[in-house]
Each structure stands twice: as structure tokens, then as C-alpha cells.
């Protein structure tokens, strides 16, 4: 969820993560990804 995403240093981004980032989970169901920079 959004809280665990933030604790892991990620941000919630709709649809898909931009290129320099990778997905580490989801935020609000499947459409919103939790993304983190390398």
C-alpha cells in the first residue's frame, strides 16, 4: 500500500514507472505502481 511504499523509499505513480525507476510494489490497487529509483 501507499504507506509501505513510502517507508521503502518509493513513490506512487499511475499506470507505469518512468524509465530510471523500477517497480517495487503497488499503491492503490494494480493501476498505481510503487516506483523507486535505483
Curated annotation (Swiss-Prot):
Keywords: Antibiotic, Antimicrobial, Defensin, Disulfide bond, Secreted. Neutrophilic granules. GO terms for cellular component: extracellular space; specific granule. One of its GO terms (biological process) is defense response to bacterium. Disulfide bonds join 5-34, 12-27, 17-35. It holds the Pfam family Defensin_beta. One of its GO terms (molecular function) is chemoattractant activity. It is found in: Secreted. It comes from the Eukaryota. Belongs to the beta-defensin family. Has bactericidal activity. Active against E.coli ML35 and S.aureus 502A. This is Beta-defensin 12. The gene is DEFB12.
Amino acid at each position: 500500500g501507499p504507506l509501505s511504499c513510502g517507508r521503502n523509499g518509493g513513490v506512487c505513480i499511475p499506470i507505469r514507472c518512468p524509465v530510471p525507476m523500477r517497480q517495487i510494489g503497488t499503491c492503490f490497487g494494480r493501476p498505481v505502481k510503487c516506483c523507486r529509483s535505483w
